[in-house]
Amino acid sequence: MTPYSAGYRRVVVLLLTAAYTFNSMDRSIVSIVAPSIKADLQLTDAQLGLLGGTAFALLYGLGGLPIARLAERASRVNIMTVALIAWSSLTAMCALAASFGQLLLIRAGVGIAEAGCSPSAHSLISDYVAPSRRASALSIYTCGISLGYVLAAALGGYLAQHAGWRMAFVAAGLPGVLTALIIKGAVREPPRGGVDAPSAAAALPPFSVRHEIAELRAVAAALVFDRPILHMVLALTLGAFAAYGFYYFIPAYFRREFELDSGPVGLISAAAGGVAVGLGILVGGALSDFLARWSARWYALVPAIGGTVSLPFYVLALVAPGWKGAAAALSLGGFFWYASLGPTFGVVQNVVDARRRATATAFLYICLSMLALGLGPLFVGWVIDRFTESSFAASGAARSFRETCPGGIAVAGAATTVQEACRSALALGSRRGLLLSVGFFAWAVGHYALASFGLNKTLAGHRSAGAAVPAASSVQSDSM
């Protein structure tokens, strides 16, 4: 039983959610101001994808495991505090970048710093909240994704339009420093495995390279060699690959297709990619915890059903003739798709013991960062570039799109027909590239469906082995 009151645990989860909100905000701000950066620094969409995905994700993934292993032994609160101060400061420094190379380097630094957030946070939450409520608690934490996106979209869109993209980075970075100090003062380091069976809280032996390698192999085996868990991990990775690419370029699509300014696009992104997504995350976690009282299969079925329903809405968002219909469809697609996150994270935390949770989360975030975030925006940006070039060539243009429309805009003094050809080709290329990414959402749904077979047996086996406690009723005061 946890020694902390339900009220204090709620405060802890909310403070960790605030940290993840700034994590998401500092990551998302690039996609919101991407058109302004593209025009200012004369970049291609593939370079934008590199900035928003690969540069950040490569270092995020490489830094995740060492920091996670440190979090299994050292204070997770201290790790989060230092990491939050570092990535917030580096985000603000993006305003000083004068070239693509400089901005790329700073974003790589942000990636290293942000690697200290979620492994520590997931481990902390799992030591404050019992297994029967973890999907719900982790859903609240994961809402930081949508909250950060809302702030990035609303604030970044407004500042990009009225003060420039550089000021947007400053505004996104600085508040995180204050949040880090509050977390350091308010959040206590909980006992490892305090809400789990005794075997889950076993102490680690003294540090040795051999032991660390053995621990990494054990966690990897838990995620890879158990078929239902592997399907959950594959589904999460494929869905994130699609989502990172899709949501990175959807603000640009609204500007290109409907000729909207940064401010309105920011508000649309905040509502459709933030509020609706956040509600979906919360509902998915709470619903799966509730239905899992009868069958643990619902931890996979809720994402599978929600993902299936989301697909036609994502397609409709890209073929709707007006921005209002597109925004409404985008909101519904995000609501149903993102119901998958809480159940997936909750299941993973429940199949490893207390001294391996940060490491398990780090493995997940390697998939989410190096594969999904690292390649998703880059892939979608590359596909958009290819579709745009082919659309522009089909219009009968004598020169390539990049030569005629540097930065996506016709050269100064170009004829009206050339300006319209540039705009039309870019809008059509964006639509086709984003439609292609929806196919990866469908692929992920298939893995969630497959995960539902055998998930009952998997989770029951871990409960009997002492990796988790059985029912909510066996732990007093564990309600969020």
Model-derived regions: residue spans:
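Helix-loop-helix hairpin linking two adjacent transmembrane segments in secondary transporters
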Residues: Y141-R192
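Juxtamembrane intracellular "pre-TM" segments in multi-pass secondary transporters
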Residues: T2-S5, G194-M232, E257
